[in-house]
Design a protein with these regions (language model features):
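Short, compositionally biased P/S/T/A/G/V-rich stretches that sit at domain boundaries
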Residues: 85-111
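Aromatic-rich peripheral "rim/lid" segments of glycoside hydrolase catalytic domains that contact
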Residues: 258-260, 317-318, 347, 368, ...
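Substrate-binding cleft and catalytic face of glycoside hydrolase catalytic domains
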Residues: 238-416, 452, 549-557
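Gram-positive cell-envelope targeting signals
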Residues: 1-79, 83
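Aromatic/hydrophobic beta-strand junction motif of beta-rich domains
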Residues: 111-126
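Noncatalytic carbohydrate-binding groove/subsite architecture in carbohydrate-active enzymes
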Residues: 229, 335-338, 350-355, 379-520
Length: 607
C-alpha cells in the first residue's frame, strides 16, 4: 500500500511544479514586454502566494483520502488474514505411521517404460521437508534400508503420484521389487504404507492373445505315451494337465542332438536342457493342435545342480517337492527367468500354448509337497505368496492373459494338532490378506477335492466319523465333490474377490477315484463329481487323474486311470467320453441306483 501511495504523491507533486514554472514564465515574459521591473516582482510574488495556496489546499483535500485508503487497506488485510487457513501438519507416531498413506494403485503405464504409484493422505504429515519419497525394497526385506536412495520424489499433497522406471529385462529390473512411500524424519526415511508391488505386469506382454473359451469342463492328466494314438480325440478332452519339475529343465544338455538353449533374462544368462525342452515342445504342441487348454504345474524338485531354487528353511528335509526360494536374490532371479522363459516359449503356438500355470502342488501340506521347516502360518503363507507373485509377474509379462493358480488339497478346516499341514481355509485367507495388502493380483485356485480317505470311491456312503468331517458348513473339515460349493461360496466373500470385484478363477486340477473298489463304482463316482462341478458356474475345469493307471499309485491302493497299465479300457472310459455329449444320460443312468437317488438334483445343489 505504501508503494501505491508513493506513486500517487509523486504524480501530484509533478503537477504543482509544472504550474509554478508556467506562472513564472508568464511573469518573465510580461516583464520583458512591459519593461517594468516592479511588474515582474509583483507577478513573482503572486506566483509564490498561488503556489503556497495550492499546496495548502492540496494537503487539506489529500489527507482525508490518504486516511480513507489506509483504512481500506487495513480492512482488506484483516479479511485476507481471516480467510487464509494455516497449513495443518499431523505429527507422525508409532501408531499412525504404518498406514498413513493410502495407496490407490501401483501400475505400469503401457508403452512408457515407467510405473506410477498413486496415493493419498487425509492430512499432510510433519517431517524434515515438504516431500514424499518413493523407495525400492527387495522382496525378502522386512524393513527399509536407510542407505537406500529414493527413486522418485514429489511435493506433499493430499493426492499425489510417484513415477519411476520399470527397467524391464535389465539387471536393475523393478518387476519383482516392492515399494514404499516415505518421508524424512530426523534425517531418516520413515515408511508410511505397506510395501507395494507392480500389479499389472501384463502391460509389458508382447502377446495379448485371449484366454481360450471351452464348451466343456472335462479334462485329464494326460499320458505322454498316448498323445498321438487318437485316444485324446476319442475322449473329447478339453483340458489337460502336465507336470514341469523345474530343476529337470535347467542346465546344459548332454545329448548333442538337442543343443542347450541359452536364455538371457535381467542381464543373467541361463542354460535350459534342450532335450527336456524338446519333450515339452512335443507334448504342448500336440495338445494345442487338438484345441485343448493346457495347465502346466510348476514343481520345485531338489537338484544338487540347482540349490538356489530351494528355500533356506527347506534344505534340511526330504520330501517330494520343496518350498521355492524367495528369501535370496539367486532364488528369485532363477524363478523369474524360468517363468519368463516358459511363458514366452509356450504362448503363440509355435511350441504349443500354455494358458494355465499352477505354482507347486498341494502346498498346504508342508511336510510332503512343499517342504519347509515348521513356521507359523503367516510366515509360511508369505513365502508361498511371494513365490506366486514372482511367477505371476514373470509369466504375465510374457503372456498377458495367462492365469496363475495356487494349489490346495481337500483339508479345509480340520484344526489338527499335527504340524504337517495347514488348513486350506486358513491358507487362502492369509495368502489373500498378504497379496491384497501389497498389491492385489488375479491369482486363482487349483483345488484337489479328492474323496476322504483317498481310496473311498463310494464317498456318498460315508458314515460315522468320516461323515461328520464332510458338511455343507463353511467350517467343514474336509471338502470333496459332495460339498465343493463350500469353496466357491467362500471365494465369493467380498474380501476374497479380485481388485475388479470378480470371483477368482477356480479349476479342479486333480481328483480321481480308484477302480480297486469296483470299476462301476469308479465310473459312478466320476459321474457324480462331473455333474457337481458342471453345475457350479465358478468352476472352469475338472481335470481327472489320470488317463492311465500309475504303478506307484496302484501300489498304494489307487488305480485312478481310465485304462489299466496294460492298456485295457475300464468301465469309466465310455462314461468319461460321453458325459458332456448329447445323450449323456444313457451313459450315466446306471450311477443313480448305485448312489441311491432317483434324480441328480437330490445330490447336486442348484447354483
Amino acid at each position: 500500500m505504501k508503494k501505491r501511495e508513493g506513486r500517487r504523491r509523486r504524480k501530484k507533486m509533478g503537477i504543482r511544479k509544472l504550474t509554478a514554472i508556467y506562472v513564472a514564465v508568464v511573469a518573465i515574459c510580461a516583464c520583458a514586454a512591459g519593461g517594468g521591473i516592479w511588474w515582474a516582482f509583483w507577478l513573482n510574488d503572486r506566483t509564490s502566494q498561488t503556489a503556497q495556496l495550492e499546496t495548502a489546499t492540496t494537503e487539506e483535500t489529500e489527507e482525508p483520502q490518504i486516511q480513507e485508503e489506509l483504512a481500506e487497506t487495513e480492512a482488506e488485510s484483516e479479511t485476507e488474514t481471516e480467510t487464509e487457513e494455516p497449513e495443518v501438519y499431523v505429527e507422525l507416531t508409532e501408531e499412525n505411521r504404518a498406514h498413513f498413506v493410502q495407496v490407490e494403485s501401483c501400475e505400469i503405464q503401457p508403452g512408457s517404460g515407467t510405473f506410477t504409484l498413486k496415493a493419498s493422505v487425509e492430512e499432510k504429515p510433519a517431517s524434515d521437508d515438504d516431500n514424499f519419497y518413493l523407495l525400492e525394497m527387495n522382496m525378502y526385506d522386512t524393513e527399509l534400508n536407510q542407505d537406500a536412495e529414493s527413486i522418485a520424489t514429489v511435493p506433499k499433497d493430499k493426492e499425489f503420484s510417484l513415477q519411476a522406471g520399470v527397467n524391464e529385462n535389465q539387471t536393475d529390473s523393478r518387476l519383482y521389487s516392492k515399494f514404499v512411500v516415505a518421508v524424512k524424519l530426523d534425517g531418516e526415511y520413515v515408511p508410511l504404507c505397506d510395501p507395494q508391488y507392480i500389479t499389472n505386469p501384463e502391460a509389458l506382454a508382447a502377446y495379448q492373445g485371449a484366454f481360450p473359451s471351452q464348451e466343456s469342463i472335462k479334462g485329464i492328466l494326460v499320458d505322454p505315451m498316448k498323445l498321438t494314438g487318437g485316444e485324446l480325440d476319442d475322449l473329447g478332452v478339453h483340458h489337460a494337465a502336465y507336470n514341469i519339475p523345474i530343476s529337470n529343465i535347467l542346465g546344459e544338455t548332454t545329448n548333442g542332438n538337442y543343443p542347450t538353449i541359452y536364455y538371457t533374462y535381467n542381464g543373467i544368462t541361463y542354460a535350459f536342457n534342450g532335450q527336456r525342452i524338446a519333450e515339452y515342445d512335443h507334448v504342448f504342441s500336440i495338445l494345442t493342435q487338438k484345441g485343448i487348454t493346457i495347465t502346466a504345474i510348476l514343481l520345485n524338485n531338489k537338484s544338487a545342480a540347482q540349490p538356489q531354487l530351494i528355500h533356506p528353511l527347506s534344505r534340511d528335509g526330504s520330501a517330494y517337492y520343496y518350498a521355492f526360494n524367495t528369501a535370496e536374490d539367486a532364488g528369485i532371479e532363477t524363478m523369474a527367468a524360468v517363468g519368463a522363459f516358459l511363458a514366452q516359449r509356450y504362448r503363440d503356438g509355435e511350441h504349443g500354448t500354455v494358458m494355465n500355470w499352477i505354482v507347486g502342488n498341494e502346498v498346504n501340506v508342508r511336510s510332503d509337497w512343499n517342504y519347509m521347516q515348521y513356521v507359523d502360518l503367516e510366515t509360511y503363507a508369505r513365502e508361498y505368496a511371494n513365490a506366486v507373485r514372482v511367477f505371476y509377474n514373470s509369466i504375465k509379462s510374457m503372456n498377458a492373459n495367462a492365469r496363475v493358480y495356487v494349489s490346495m488339497d481337500q483339508q479345509w478346516d480340520r484344526n489338527l494338532s499335527s504340524k504337517n499341514s495347514y488348513d486350506v481355509k486358513d491358507m487362502l485367507a492369509e495368502i489373500n490378506r498378504i497379496v491384497s495388502a501389497e498389491g492385489n493380483i488375479d491369482w486363482g485356485l487349483a483345488h484337489h477335492p479328492y474323496a476322504y480317505p483317498l481310496d473311498n470311491t463310494t464317498f456318498w456312503n460315508s458314515s460315522g466319523k468320516i461323515r461328520s468331517l464332510i458338511t455343507a458348513s463353511e467350517n467343514t473339515s474336509i471338502v470333496t465333490m459332495e460339498n465343493i460349493q463350500v469353496v466357491t461360496d467362500y471365494l465369493q466373500r467380498p474380501e476374497m474377490l479380485t481388485a475388479e470385484g470378480e470371483v477368482r478363477p477356480v479349476i479342479l486340477s486333480e481328483l480321481g477315484y480308484s477302480s480297486l473298489d469296483g470299476e462301476v463304482n469308479q465310473a459312478a463316482a466320476f459321474a457324480y463329481a462331473y455333474y457337481a462341478a458342471d453345475s457350479n458356474p465358478y468352476i472352469d475345469a475338472m481335470i481327472l487323474s489320470r488317463q492311465t493307471d500309475a504303478a506307484e499309485e496302484v501300489a498304494q491302493g489307487l488305480a485312478l486311470g481310465l485304462s489299466t497299465q496294460s492298456g485295457r479300457r475300464k468301465f469309466i472310459y465310455d462314461v468319461f467320453k460321453n458325459i458332456d455329449q448329447p445323450g449323456a444320460e444313457t451313459y450315466t443312468e446306471f450311477a443313480k441306483s448305485i448312489i441311491g437317488i432317483n434324480s441328480w438334483s437330490e445330490v447336486i445343489a442348484s447354483r
